Amino acid sequence: MALDKSVILLPLLVLVLLVLGCLGRESRAKKFQRQHMDSGSSPSSNSTYCNQMMKRRSMTQGRCKPVNTFVHEPLVDVQNVCFQEKVTCKNGQTNCFKSKSSMHITDCRLTNGSRYPNCAYRTSPKERRIIVACEGSPYVPVHFDASVEDST
């Protein structure tokens, strides 16, 4: 009798643990938003912007992320890039798209000699076209691939 219950309860326990694990995991779209979206602010020439944002957005935990870009445009405008000019991603995949117009961004680059846990970044505000990888349903940005100067 006790063995019958354990045979039934064990698979149920495994299923519950799998579901709970998935619920706690950040989706690729949410990770993109956390790492790259800063819609509520303008590009800042404040030299501490990147140091503050990289720490606030959990990109200096365990290591210093070497490069990151924040986009200062409404999320819907960045999501719309997924339906603009299709381009090849840096890694050769074909799910990247380039914005049709320039966007306000801030590039953050780890300064030479900076080491974890004292991550220090150079802040560079720019206006550039962005290239993002998109996937899912709905089709949304999941990876920031690059930024390029507007050729027009």
Swiss-Prot record:
Glycosylation site list: 46, 112
GO CC, any one term: extracellular region
Coiled-coil regions listed in the entry: none
InterPro entries the UniProt entry points to: RNaseA (IPR001427), RNaseA-like_dom_sf (IPR036816), RNaseA_AS (IPR023411), RNaseA_domain (IPR023412)
UniProt keywords, alphabetically: Disulfide bond, Endonuclease, Glycoprotein, Hydrolase, Lyase, Nuclease, Secreted, Signal
EC number: 4.6.1.18
One Gene Ontology molecular-function label: lyase activity
Protein's UniProt keywords contain Acetylation: no
Classification via SUPFAM superfamilies: RNase A-like
Superkingdom of this protein's organism: Eukaryota
PROSITE patterns: RNASE_PANCREATIC
Residues bound to substrate: 31, 34, 65-69, 90, 109
Pfam family, one: RnaseA
Catalytic activity: an [RNA] containing cytidine + H2O = an [RNA]-3'-cytidine-3'-phosphate + a 5'-hydroxy-ribonucleotide-3'-[RNA]; an [RNA] containing uridine + H2O = an [RNA]-3'-uridine-3'-phosphate + a 5'-hydroxy-ribonucleotide-3'-[RNA]
Active-site residues annotated for this sequence: 36, 143
Localization annotation: Secreted
One BP annotation, GO: defense response to Gram-positive bacterium
Gene3D superfamilies registered for this protein in UniProt: Ribonuclease A-like domain (3.10.130.10)
Enzyme class label: lyase
Signal peptide annotation: 1-24
Disulfide bonds: 50-108, 64-119, 82-134, 89-96
Quaternary structure and interacting proteins, as annotated: Monomer. Interacts with and forms tight 1:1 complexes with RNH1. Dimerization of two such complexes may occur. Interaction with RNH1 inhibits this protein.
Stated family: Belongs to the pancreatic ribonuclease family.
Function: Endonuclease that catalyzes the cleavage of RNA on the 3' side of pyrimidine nucleotides. Acts on single-stranded and double-stranded RNA.
Protein name: Ribonuclease pancreatic
Gene: RNASE1
